Amino acid sequence: MVNDTIADMLTRIRNANLAKHQIVQIPLTKVTKSIAQVLLREELINSFEELRNGTQSSLLLSLKYTGKTRTPSIQKIQRISKPGLRIYSGAKKMPRVLGGFGTAIISTSNGLMTDTEARQKNVGGEILCYIT
């Protein structure tokens, strides 16, 4: 049993990118599905699909690679707010990842969204991860 499903998801994506895997399987929870939707909206993955096998459900992510050398579109993915140390940010002090070239996924009262969307909607929340 994994305690931190978000960190588990990010680690699986990181490992699959290093091994140049096309598809990665992740345990399905509401949060992992929401993160996958944000990644799809930001065009960092090709697609995702829910798989239900009896009692266990999983999420299949199709990772995105570019060019002949198959460079992953997700170069670095890093967990920020952890179960032992939560990190929150208001709408005014929302962090910019790599000066705006990266993306932060924020958990707000309006659901999961990127830092740019949170700034536009003027909402703050918990900073889940940074993606570059």
UniProtKB/Swiss-Prot annotation:
One of its GO terms (biological process) is translation. It holds the Pfam family Ribosomal_S8. Gene3D superfamilies: 3.30.1370.30, 3.30.1490.10. Keywords: Chloroplast, Plastid, Ribonucleoprotein, Ribosomal protein, RNA-binding, rRNA-binding. Disulfide bonds: none annotated. It comes from the Eukaryota. One of its GO terms (cellular component) is chloroplast. It is found in: Plastid, Chloroplast. One of its GO terms (molecular function) is rRNA binding. One of the primary rRNA binding proteins, it binds directly to 16S rRNA central domain where it helps coordinate assembly of the platform of the 30S subunit. Part of the 30S ribosomal subunit. PANTHER family: 40S RIBOSOMAL PROTEIN S15A (PTHR11758). Belongs to the universal ribosomal protein uS8 family. This is Small ribosomal subunit protein uS8c.
